[in-house]
Amino acid sequence: MSAVAGCTATTDPGWEVDAFGGVSSLCQPMEADLYGCSDPCWWPAQVPDMMSTYQDWNAQASNSAEDWRNLGTVFPKDK
């Protein structure tokens, strides 16, 4: 997903207006259109703004469906 420089640069079709030219009920429910709504103009609180990658957190679980117990837990470093 690419980030845009402002709300005026958002070009996700259907995000700007609905079929009647209004903005009511867009992105409702949130789960139905999370990708279309996730840009700098609107981002739900439960979705992270950024992700950090931790190397080797899944080194012991090559197949997460079978080896899910071996997935590592990542804790942030204390400051």
UniProtKB/Swiss-Prot annotation:
Belongs to the quinohemoprotein amine dehydrogenase subunit gamma family. NCBIfam families: QH_gamma. Keywords: CTQ, Electron transport, Oxidation, Oxidoreductase, Periplasm, Thioether bond, Transport. The lineage of its organism: Bacteria, Pseudomonadati, Pseudomonadota, Gammaproteobacteria, Pseudomonadales. The keyword Electron transport applies. There is a cross-link at residues 7-16 (4-cysteinyl-glutamic acid (Cys-Glu)). The modification Tryptophylquinone is found at residue 43. The cysteine tryptophylquinone (CTQ) is generated by oxidation of the indole ring of a tryptophan residue to form tryptophylquinone, followed by covalent cross-linking with a cysteine residue. It comes from Pseudomonas putida. This is Quinohemoprotein amine dehydrogenase subunit gamma. There is a cross-link at residues 27-33, 41-49 (3-cysteinyl-aspartic acid (Cys-Asp)).
